[in-house]
Every structure is written in structure tokens, then in C-alpha cells.
A protein has these predicted regions:
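TPR/TPR-like (Sel1-like) alpha-helical repeat modules
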Residues: 152-169
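Hydrophobic/aromatic packing residues within the alpha-helices of TPR/SEL1-like helical repeat arrays
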Residues: 52-55, 89, 124, 161
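Glycine-centered coil turns and helix-coil junctions that link the paired helices
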Residues: 43, 60-61, 72-78, 95, ...
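Alpha-helical linker/edge segments of TPR/alpha-solenoid repeat scaffolds
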Residues: 112-115, 149-152, 179-206
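Hydrophobic face of amphipathic alpha-helices that form TPR/SEL1-like repeat modules
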Residues: 40, 65-74, 100-109, 123, ...
Length: 304
């Protein structure tokens, strides 16, 4: 198997950063080569034998070559050697153009040489010749939005923020900046923007609901037969503070109030693009109040 994952996402995985959609690779004797190389790199120290293992795998697998390049770039397991890191990346771009993103990062940050934003922009743009590399697309969007290493191109930035949004948290903020500057969108782009907005809000609300569920457990306010609480958050364009109302009660007013309090400081991170006749928008969020985990609920459903 020589399936190539997004190289910037691979770097984020190695460093422990969160990126939506990243594979969660775990160390095991039966790992696929890409996963094996990443798991070795994530170790606090790398043995000489493991270095040789990665060196061998790097001759066959692009991502293992990138890992070896990162080892030289950061001096992890081997002596730091920027030319070797750059050489490894350059040797792989013919097999996978997304590796250009590593060369872009080196040029942008002045690794192994002076900062060169013109070269960084060129490398990043080369890295997104094939779609599906969200982190690299986000970098291109930033360079185009702010005119780094070349002329400003807001429509180009819009294109790449829209394509990177499923994998990068900051894309929605970039889209909001472009909207505030009056950048126009096609009907299809508006629909895509609204999908991104809804996905982001649902993700944030799900995390908020999980936090509230933990609070209920800690304060012993859960009961096995308690009903879920559903709230509605209604927004008005230009006003980030939602109007929050109770849609479904748990049957316990104290629990309901605790849930409502948990949403009290929530703010919409952006706003959707509404048709002229629509003045408000809303979304619902549900908090489980039975004190069970998702696995426990699933097991109960299976046993029925």
C-alpha cells in the first residue's frame, strides 16, 4: 500500500495537533508502513535500529520519506541536516506534488536559509495541484488573501478557503474576513459556505453538549430514566448572541435550567448567508441527561 495522506496533515499528526479527518495511527507490530513511520517519529527518542527502518521504508513509501525529512529537519533521531531534509522532500515531489508543502513551510519559516515568501507561495501552490490537501489549500488561501509572496487575490483565497474548510479550523474565519470585505460568491459558493457554517456550529455545539453532560454527572444531576434536553439557538445576522429556548424538557426543571445555563455564553462563530426574505436562523442541540456513555447506550440498543 502506498496511499499518500495530506502531508501537512501528516505533520500536524506527528506534532500532536488536532486536524479534522486525520487518521489516528497507533503503534503495533502489524502496522502499515506509513503508520509505522509516523508512530516511530512520535516517540520521545528514536533508536538507531528504528532510524534504519525508516530509512529503508523511505525508499518505497512517500510518507516515510517525509518522516525521514522531518527527522533531519528537526534533529529527531538523527543529526539536524537541512540540506538532507530538503533533498528528501525534493526527491518525492514527482511522486506526490503535495510534498511541495514541506518545501513551502521551510521557505516560509526560513528553515535552512532566509525567509523566502515568493518561493513559499510557489511551493504551496504546486502542492495543491491535486485536490484534497486541506492544510496546503489553507496555506495557499492565506498567501492569496494577504498578498504574501505575490499579488493579493481575494477570489483565489475564497476558492481555497472553501475547499480547505472541512479539514482546517481557521477556514471559516478566513471566509468571514472575505465576506466583510465584500468578496462576491456564486450561488454554489454560497451553498458551500452555508454547509461549512452549519458543520462548524454543529461541531462546537456537540462539544458544548458533552461538556454540559460532564457537569451534570459531576453534580449528580443525572438519572438513568431521565429524558434528553433539547435547546434551540436562534440567531439574527449581525448579532452573535443567540436567543436560547427549551424545546424538550428532561422532566426535571433543575436539570433543564442547568443545561440552559451551560449554553448561556455560547456565541455563533459566524453567520450564514440567508435569502432576503429570511430574517433569522436557528439550530438545535441535545444534551443527554441519563449519565450514560455513547457505548453504554449502543450496547443497550443492541441487547434489545
Amino acid at each position: 500500500m502506498n496511499k499518500v495522506v495530506t502531508l501537512l496533515a501528516l505533520t500536524a499528526l506527528i506534532s500532536g495537533c488536532k486536524t479534522l479527518g486525520e487518521p489516528q495511527l497507533q503503534s503495533s507490530k502489524n502496522q502499515l508502513p506509513d503508520a509505522r513511520c509516523v508512530s516511530i517519529y512520535k516517540q520521545p527518542s528514536i533508536s538507531a535500529r528504528e532510524v534504519e527502518e525508516i530509512r529503508y521504508l523511505s525508499t518505497q513509501y512517500v510518507n516515510c520519506a517525509v518522516v525521514l525529512g522531518l527527522m533531519y529537519e528537526h534533529g529527531h533521531g538523527v543529526a539536524q541536516d537541512f540540506p538532507k531534509a530538503r533533498g528528501l522532500y525534493e526527491s518525492m515531489v514527482g511522486r506526490d506534488p503535495s510534498v511541495y508543502s514541506r518545501l513551502g513551510a521551510m521557505a516560509e519559516n526560513g528553515v535552512g536559509g532566509p525567509v523566502d515568501l515568493v518561493a513559499a507561495r510557489d511551493f504551496y501552490q504546486r502542492s495543491v495541484v491535486n485536490p484534497g490537501h486541506a492544510d496546503a489549500e489553507f496555506k495557499v488561501a492565506e498567501f492569496l488573501e494577504f498578498g504574501k509572496g505575490g499579488p493579493q487575490d481575494l477570489q483565489g483565497a475564497l476558492k481555497y478557503y472553501l475547499s480547505s474548510a472541512n479539514g482546517v479550523d481557521g477556514a471559516l474565519s478566513g471566509l468571514q474576513r472575505l465576506r466583510s470585505r465584500g468578496v462576491t460568491m456564486t450561488t454554489a459558493q454560497q451553498a458551500r459556505y452555508n454547509e461549512i457554517f452549519e458543520s462548524d456550529v454543529r461541531y462546537r455545539l456537540r462539544n458544548r453538549a458533552l461538556a454540559i453532560e460532564e457537569t451534570l454527572k459531576k453534580e449528580r444531576m443525572t438519572a438513568r430514566d431521565s429524558q434528553p434536553v433539547t435547546v434551540q439557538l436562534e440567531g439574527i445576522p449581525g448579532v452573535p448572541v443567540p436567543t436560547i429556548s427549551l424545546v424538550q424538557s428532561s422532566g426535571n426543571s433543575a436539570v433543564d435550567q442547568k443545561v440552559l445555563q451551560g449554553y448561556a455564553d455560547y456565541r455563533f462563530p459566524a453567520e450564514p448567508i440567508l435569502p432576503p426574505e429570511q430574517k433569522t436562523y436557528w439550530i438545535r442541540s441535545t444534551v443527554m441527561t441519563d449519565g450514560k456513555t455513547d457505548l453504554q447506550r449502543m450496547a443497550e440498543l443492541i441487547s434489545k
